[in-house]
């Protein structure tokens, strides 16, 4: 392995050791725009407050996001961090694949339907580290 690549690999390893808890959700069947509205509500909040806020949201993306936060919290507690001090440091919502379908219309025509998906990444930190 070249020296520069070795340094990059070592830097990634050190960064992984310093992480508190991460989780990612791939191919959520909703558009990124709709999921970002819910993600913006909980960004930067304490984890327990985020659970409460998501429990009372009527949007469809709130339940998968709540499960994702639960997974990230479980990853953090597995690494030995206290779940009461966890904060949502970063939450990113990316566009996923778009499945293209067609709906038949009048006079032999067809109109396209775009079924969008979303990828969500969450990184937690402790309240003390901020």
Give residue spans per PLM region.
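Structured, basic alpha/beta domains of bacterial-type, RNA-associated proteins
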Residues: 2-30, 36-41, 45-130
